[in-house]
């Protein structure tokens, strides 16, 4: 009798293990399929609306009027439309077609103005997907060589922003990231905090000047429980703008001094 009970118990345990393995295997397969579909949908929107640095904003707006920008980082998988929802939950697990997907979208904080120059701190969020998509490559900015050589490109209907990181680090999640500051002193104190957190020595020189907006990029990090990778950046003047300024200065020099 005892042997029968033992055999029955073992059979139950084996069946339970098989059911559990099947369930988790199915979930892993479903996540894999979902990730593949997510990558495919983003690849499709790139082909349909983006040629090099040219974005077809009319097409994008027809797909989703919540799209406010496009983010791109050379040498990474970061090449996505940026949306802004009514709340920060709107696109956490919703793609640009407004369909459920775990990977969601790259999104601008709902409290920010889509005109980036009007904000004290433009905050962007994205998932750190295990397959390397979305904001997974954001962690590369914590490497000296990568952070020094790479820029974050933000395309909007009105302007292209070239951003250089001035602080990059991983820490436990901030309960809230400031969007606005009461005054310059408060902003300076926040910038000092970011400088002290920074783990990449070569980029500290890029700190924002007075009245320059901060650009913050946040994603999950796997160093510890509830960790995040944060990258803070500032706009840099592009070479074309520098050349234009130089041409204007030369023109005035010729007119007034020669």
Whereabouts are the PLM-identified features?
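Hydrophobic membrane-insertion alpha-helices, especially the h-region
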Residues: 9-25
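Cysteine-centered motifs
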Residues: 239-242, 250
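N-terminal Lys/Arg-rich, disordered targeting/topogenic segments
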Residues: 1-4
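Targeting/processing segments of secretory and organellar proteins
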Residues: 248-250, 254-255
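Solvent-exposed, non-transmembrane regions of membrane-associated and secreted proteins
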Residues: 21-238
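Intrinsically disordered, low-complexity serine/threonine-rich segments
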Residues: 7, 241-245
């Amino acid at each position: 009798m005892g042997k029968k009970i033992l055999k029955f118990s073992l059979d139950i345990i084996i069946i339970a293990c098989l059911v559990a393995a099947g369930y988790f295997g199915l979930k892993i397969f479903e996540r894999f399929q979902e990730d593949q579909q997510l990558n495919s949908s983003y690849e499709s929107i790139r082909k349909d609306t983006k040629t090099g640095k040219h974005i077809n904003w009319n097409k994008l707006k027809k797909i989703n009027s919540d799209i406010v920008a496009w983010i791109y980082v050379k040498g990474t998988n970061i090449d996505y439309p940026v949306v802004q929802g009514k709340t920060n939950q709107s696109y956490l697990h919703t793609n640009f077609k407004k369909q459920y997907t775990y990977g969601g979208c790259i999104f601008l904080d709902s409290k920010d103005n889509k005109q980036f120059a009007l904000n004290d701190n433009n905050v962007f969020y994205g998932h750190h997907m295990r397959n390397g998509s979305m904001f997974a490559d954001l962690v590369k900015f914590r490497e000296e060589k990568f952070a020094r050589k790479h820029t974050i490109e933000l395309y909007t209907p009105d302007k292209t922003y070239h951003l250089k990181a001035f602080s990059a680090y991983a820490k436990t999640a901030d309960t809230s990231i400031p969007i606005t500051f009461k005054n310059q002193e408060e902003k300076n104190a926040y910038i000092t905090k970011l400088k002290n957190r920074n783990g990449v020595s070569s980029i500290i020189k890029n700190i924002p000047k007075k009245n320059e907006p901060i650009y913050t990029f946040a994603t999950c990090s796997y160093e510890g429980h509830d960790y995040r990778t944060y990258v803070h950046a500032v706009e840099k003047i592009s070479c074309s703008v520098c050349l234009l300024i130089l041409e204007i200065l030369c023109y005035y020099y010729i007119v007034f001094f020669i």
